[in-house]
Amino acid sequence: MTQPMPGKPAEDAENELDIRGLFRTLWAGKLWIIGMGLAFALIALAYTFFARQEWSSTAITDRPTVNMLGGYYSQQQFLRNLDVRSNMASADQPSVMDEAYKEFVMQLASWDTRREFWLQTDYYKQRMVGNSKADAALLDEMINNIQFIPGDFTRAVNDSVKLIAETAPDANNLLRQYVAFASQRAASHLNDELKGAWAARTIQMKAQVKRQEEVAKAIYDRRMNSIEQALKIAEQHNISRSATDVPAEELPDSEMFLLGRPMLQARLENLQAVGPAFDLDYDQNRAMLNTLNVGPTLDPRFQTYRYLRTPEEPVKRDSPRRAFLMIMWGIVGGLIGAGVALTRRCSK
């Protein structure tokens, strides 16, 4: 059996924490604790009145409807139909609405779009100080205040964008302006692509029509030459009527003179009057070329998105959070007050 060493209980007693004594000390210094807590809370309250406020507004977007795209949709679909006829388009290509929305999202998340937007706003111009470095830092901060959050279609989450400003009305109005600005830039890019694609299809269709005309003209010239040669032979041999029972369509060119001079003369005059023969495909290409020659009708302000959540004025500010700061700094002040109370007690 182990025997306790002499003096051990006294040593343990010295090392024990006197909980009751601690609470008595804190209770005695309660004025310090409460006072410091209130002082720090009031300082935090005063800070919230002078600190720069941050309010955020959020918008959720999705792809536009056909009506929102206006004339762009019909003209883009016309070009797609041309590609389908010429076997230039894949069967699984995205819809016109998907392509328009993809361009909008690209502009919405673009750094350049955010920069150009702020540079043309009065909100930024009013906060410029005339110092290039300070203004550049301010511009970078404002660019970062527009945050694009891409959607996750596997979880049915749509794209969203958030804008932070110093007042609730500014956050709402600036976000609406930014979304419209990004849509206008997207529409401009899409119109440029439409013009380029339209010009390319026009060149292709002109080349195709010209090729069809050259083929038809070559067939026509060859047919004319064949009949003229057969007519000369018939005149030389004085063949005044058909000397064969074979239908004219089945006669080879080398025996066409057997049809006789009158029939050959009639066929020659008929061919001259009718001219080159074109098929239905040529007529369709000609009609489409006439449409392409008119050129596209561009709408600079068609809408490339639709709202699932329209921006509104926020009712709660993001920063500074008054209640949170007062509670946090009140606790810090209380802890400091407790430290002061303990220090004063020890000094006594």
From Swiss-Prot:
Q: Which GO terms of the cellular component aspect does the record hold?
A: plasma membrane
**UniProt KW keywords:** Cell inner membrane, Cell membrane, Membrane, Transmembrane, Transmembrane helix
Pathway, per UniProt?
A: Bacterial outer membrane biogenesis; enterobacterial common antigen biosynthesis
Ranges in the topological domain labelled Cytoplasmic = 1-30, 344-348
GO annotations under biological process? enterobacterial common antigen biosynthetic process
Q: Where in the cell is it found?
A: Cell inner membrane
Q: What top-level branch of life does the organism fall under? A: Bacteria
Gene Ontology molecular function:
protein tyrosine kinase activity
What does the UniProt entry report for the null mutant?
A: Null mutation abolishes ECA(CYC) synthesis.
Q: Write down the Gene3D superfamilies for this protein, in alphabetical order.
A: FepE-like
Membrane topology for this entry? Multi-pass membrane protein
Pfam families linked: Wzz (PF02706)
- According to the UniProt topology, which residue ranges lie Periplasmic? 52-322
Q: Give the residue spans that cross the bilayer.
A: 31-51, 323-343
SUPFAM superfamilies in the record: Bacterial polysaccharide co-polymerase-like
Function field: Modulates the polysaccharide chain length of enterobacterial common antigen (ECA). Required for the assembly of the phosphoglyceride-linked form of ECA (ECA(PG)) and the water-soluble cyclic form of ECA (ECA(CYC)).
State the oligomer form and interacting partners. Probably part of a complex composed of WzxE, WzyE and WzzE.
Q: Which family does it belong to?
A: Belongs to the WzzB/Cld/Rol family.
What name appears for this protein in its UniProt entry?
ECA polysaccharide chain length modulation protein
